[in-house]
């Protein structure tokens, strides 16, 4: 079978520094799925961007190599030819939908733009194709979403829009850079099965870039492993998982989340007691229009959390997980009762609530976006102390150093800035910022979703160690059920703002009662039997 894509001895340097991609060669045939795996910084995304010449060539050089698409070297192709290839013959699902979508254009305009450019579709024809694509990727009530802007969609919905745009012109090659990172397990399964169906219908080849080895095992036909810009191993999926030959590959395969946490004795009085929490958001007609109705995001949710325990909150995108976390911090208006150590917090105004903020901290999903690029690490970690502990400034530096040591970071690096750290290190900085105030409760909102498996495992072990040392309580919000299982003592399953199932995490993972919970667990790939014959080509 002829090769659709052949990368031959490709190297990429940035500003003549160390090679980001170092003499790699790989090929992809029509209808095949090749998974490109490796830790953050291994060169996976740089390789993908090189195929479509999307790197800034003032900073990136191509000293050697070829990228042959149907025998044509794209590295030598003129810009006019590249415009024909991009989006029509080769499409790409980018890793970060929050920054890949234009914030000034609505969803309809962004999808229709590629249809008009490559297929000449306009007006009702383009609109109908746009609706068809949104239905394909599982956007509910797509007619109401055509006029929405990116900021009005959840992370998972934005990712689905990106996938719809990539599939709009039925490309011969789809480059999928972490296509399911922001998606919950049921939508992950839907999207991957959609790609599988389209591949079978169109004979489309897929270059799948991911850090999720369970997805690789199930859907890729071949795997290429990258480390520090080099290709260290290539093999059929079943062969690589059964008998990896390179030490780095063995390290990746062994980086599974740890087992369930140790049991914690139940206390007489819960640290947190939430009763009938309710959140509604006003919806307006137009940018400056009047409020027409309210969207009911969280509906009469009740739960308790003991000191030293972790409550995992799971559910699909838009189920209300993050909204609950924001309501507990009074970042979102709510009704109902919220008690911390028996003190009613829901009726407090912002001024009265301020002393309680140091006792409830949050670690956000995106460590790069939540850390100020203009502040050093010491300034970031110290900021909370300057607000909540201004009378003891002499001890601030000591506390910053102690917090950085607690999360496994070198205090000598505290004068550096966020961009100088890896994704895993930035997440440790975010945890240190929360930890320095010695809180009772930390809300962890998707803290591991942007991290590869080896770094995920390190962060999980760090969180468990800190919890054991300080008796902290966590609310852990995630769509990754393997990580939730590793951390949670209790589990709360949400659907459309309503509790579906709530109780002991171990019991729910072993024997879920509700059908929706069963569907979630079935869709989570770690529940599938680890059999080499599971691999399904997409």
List where the protein language model places each region.
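Conserved ABC ATPase signature
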Residues: 148-153, 157, 417-421, 425
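Conserved ABC ATPase "signature" region
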Residues: 73, 125-144, 395-412, 522
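ABC ATPase "signature
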Residues: 231-235, 243, 502-503, 511
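ABC ATPase NBD coupling module
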Residues: 74-91, 109, 117, 239-244, ...
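A short, proline-enriched helix->beta-strand linker immediately N-terminal to the Walker B motif
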Residues: 168-172, 436-440
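Conserved ABC transporter NBD signature motif
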Residues: 61-73, 336-345
């Amino acid at each position: 079978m002829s090769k659709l894509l052949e990368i031959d001895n490709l190297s990429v340097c940035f500003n003549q520094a160390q090679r980001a991609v170092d003499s790699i060669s790989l090929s992809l045939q029509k209808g095949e799925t090749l998974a490109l795996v490796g830790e953050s910084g291994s060169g996976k995304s740089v390789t993908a961007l090189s195929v479509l010449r999307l790197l800034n060539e003032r900073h990136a050089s191509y000293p050697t190599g070829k990228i042959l698409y149907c025998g044509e070297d794209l590295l030598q192709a003129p810009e006019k030819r590249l415009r024909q290839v991009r989006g029509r013959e080769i499409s790409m699902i980018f890793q970060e939908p929050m920054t890949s979508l234009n914030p000034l254009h609505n969803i309809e305009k962004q999808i229709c733009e590629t249809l008009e450019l490559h297929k000449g579709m306009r007006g009702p024809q383009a609109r109908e194709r746009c609706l068809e694509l949104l239905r394909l990727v599982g956007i509910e009530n797509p007619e109401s979403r055509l006029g929405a802007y990116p900021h009005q969609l959840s992370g998972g919905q934005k990712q689905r829009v990106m996938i719809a745009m990539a599939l709009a012109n039925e490309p011969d090659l789809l480059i999928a850079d972490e296509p399911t990172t922001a998606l919950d397990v049921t939508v992950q399964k839907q999207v991957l099965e959609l790609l599988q169906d389209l591949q079978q219908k169109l004979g489309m080849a897929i270059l799948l870039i991911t850090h999720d080895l369970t997805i690789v095992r199930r859907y890729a036909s071949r795997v290429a492993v990258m480390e520090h810009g080099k290709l260290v191993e290539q093999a059929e999926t079943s062969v690589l998982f059964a008998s990896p030959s390179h030490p780095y590959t063995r390290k990746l395969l062994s980086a599974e989340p740890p087992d369930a946490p140790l049991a914690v004795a139940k206390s007489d009085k819960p640290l947190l007691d939430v009763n009938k929490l309710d959140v509604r958001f006003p919806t307006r007609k137009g940018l400056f229009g009047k409020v027409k109705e309210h969207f009911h995001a969280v509906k009469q949710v009740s739960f308790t959390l003991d000191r030293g325990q972790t409550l995992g909150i799971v559910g699909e995108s838009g189920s209300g997980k993050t909204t609950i976390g924001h309501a507990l911090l009074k970042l979102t208006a709510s009704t109902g009762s919220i008690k911390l150590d028996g003190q009613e917090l829901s009726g407090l105004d912002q001024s009265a609530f301020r002393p309680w903020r140091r006792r409830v901290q949050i670690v956000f999903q995106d460590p790069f976006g939540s850390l100020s690029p203009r502040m050093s690490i010491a300034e970031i970690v110290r900021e909370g102390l300057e607000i909540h502990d201004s009378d003891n400034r002499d001890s601030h530096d000591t506390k910053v150093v102690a917090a950085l040591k607690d999360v496994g970071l070198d205090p000598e690096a505290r004068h550096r800035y966020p961009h100088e750290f890896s994704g895993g290190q930035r997440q440790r900085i975010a945890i240190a910022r929360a930890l320095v105030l010695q809180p009772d409760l930390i809300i962890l909102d998707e803290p591991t979703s942007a991290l590869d498996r080896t770094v995920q495992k390190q962060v999980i072990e760090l969180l468990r160690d800190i919890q054991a040392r300080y008796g902290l309580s966590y609310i852990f919000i995630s769509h990754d059920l393997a990580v939730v299982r590793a951390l949670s003592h209790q589990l709360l399953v949400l659907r459309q703002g309503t509790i579906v199932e709530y109780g002991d995490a171990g019991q729910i993972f072993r024997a879920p009662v509700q059908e929706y919970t069963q569907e979630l667990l079935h869709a989570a790939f770690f529940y599938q039997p680890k059999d080499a014959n599971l691999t399904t080509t997409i």
